[in-house]
C-alpha cells in the first residue's frame, strides 16, 4: 500500500506526534502541512493569518495539501483543513483519511501542556476550553464525514499507531 495517509482532527489530538512515529513504523515519509507551509513562507501560522486573514491561510493550506500529497507519505493536516470542501474530496479521493478523535478535556490538557500552542492564533477569541469545545462541535461531523478510519486518540501514541496499523490492514484486506 503506497496511498498517502492523511491524519485529520482538532488541535491537540496528536496528528504530528502520531504521524512522525507512524511514518517511521511504516517506513514512509512524514509531512506536517502547517510546518511545510511555515517553512515555505518563513512565517508562523499566526503571522500568515495576521497578514492574510483566515481566508488567505485556508487557500495556502489547500495549496500545501496538494503540494505534499505523494505516495508513501503520512500527512498531518491542520485542524481546519476539512473546512474547505475541496480538501475533503481531495483527501478522500487521493489517500486514506484517519480521524484522530479525542474528547475536549484531553485536547485542552494536551494544548495547555504544549507551550508552542501559544503561537497559534485563536479561532474564537474565547478561553481555551470554550474554544476547543466550540470548534470540535463545529468540525466533528466534517471529520467523521471525510474519514475512512476513526481512531480513539486518547491513548499513548504507540497504542494509537497500533490501532491505525490494524485498521489499515483490515481496510486493505477487504
UniProtKB/Swiss-Prot annotation:
SUPFAM superfamilies: P-loop containing nucleoside triphosphate hydrolases (SSF52540). Binds 1 Mg(2+) ion per subunit. Its cofactor is Mg(2+). ATP binds at residues 12-17, 120. Its EC number is 2.7.1.71. CDD domains: SK. It catalyses: shikimate + ATP = 3-phosphoshikimate + ADP + H(+). Keywords: Amino-acid biosynthesis, Aromatic amino acid biosynthesis, ATP-binding, Cytoplasm, Kinase, Magnesium, Metal-binding, Nucleotide-binding, Transferase. Its main location: cytoplasm. Residues 112-126 are annotated as: LID domain. InterPro entries: P-loop_NTPase (IPR027417), Shikimate/glucono_kinase (IPR031322), Shikimate_kinase/TSH1 (IPR000623), Shikimate_kinase_2 (IPR027544), Shikimate_kinase_CS (IPR023000). Substrate binds at residues 34, 58, 79, 139. Belongs to the shikimate kinase family. AroL subfamily. Transmembrane segments: none annotated. It is found in: Cytoplasm. Catalyzes the specific phosphorylation of the 3-hydroxyl group of shikimic acid using ATP as a cosubstrate. This is Shikimate kinase 2. It comes from the Bacteria. Mg(2+) binds at residues 16, 32. One of its GO terms (molecular function) is ATP binding. Pathway: Metabolic intermediate biosynthesis; chorismate biosynthesis; chorismate from D-erythrose 4-phosphate and phosphoenolpyruvate: step 5/7. Pfam families: SKI. The LID domain closes over the active site upon ATP binding. One of its GO terms (cellular component) is cytosol. One of its GO terms (biological process) is aromatic amino acid family biosynthetic process. It comes from Escherichia coli O7:K1 (strain IAI39 / ExPEC). Monomer.
Amino acid at each position: 500500500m503506497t496511498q498517502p495517509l492523511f491524519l485529520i482532527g482538532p488541535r491537540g489530538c496528536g496528528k504530528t506526534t502520531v504521524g512522525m512515529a507512524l511514518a517511521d513504523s511504516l517506513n514512509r515519509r512524514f509531512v506536517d502541512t502547517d510546518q511545510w507551509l511555515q517553512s515555505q513562507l518563513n512565517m508562523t501560522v499566526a503571522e500568515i493569518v495576521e497578514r492574510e486573514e483566515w481566508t488567505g491561510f485556508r487557500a495556502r493550506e489547500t495549496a500545501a495539501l496538494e503540494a505534499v500529497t505523494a505516495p508513501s507519505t503520512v500527512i498531518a493536516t491542520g485542524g481546519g483543513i476539512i473546512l474547505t470542501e475541496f480538501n475533503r474530496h481531495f483527501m478522500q479521493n487521493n489517500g486514506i483519511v484517519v480521524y484522530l478523535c479525542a474528547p475536549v478535556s484531553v485536547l485542552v490538557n494536551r494544548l495547555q501542556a504544549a507551550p508552542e500552542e501559544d503561537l497559534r492564533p485563536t479561532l474564537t477569541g474565547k478561553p481555551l476550553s470554550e474554544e476547543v469545545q466550540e470548534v470540535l462541535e463545529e468540525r466533528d461531523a466534517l471529520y467523521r464525514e471525510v474519514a475512512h478510519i476513526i481512531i480513539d486518540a486518547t491513548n499513548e501514541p504507540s497504542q494509537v499507531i497500533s490501532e491505525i496499523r490494524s485498521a489499515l490492514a483490515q481496510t486493505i484486506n477487504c
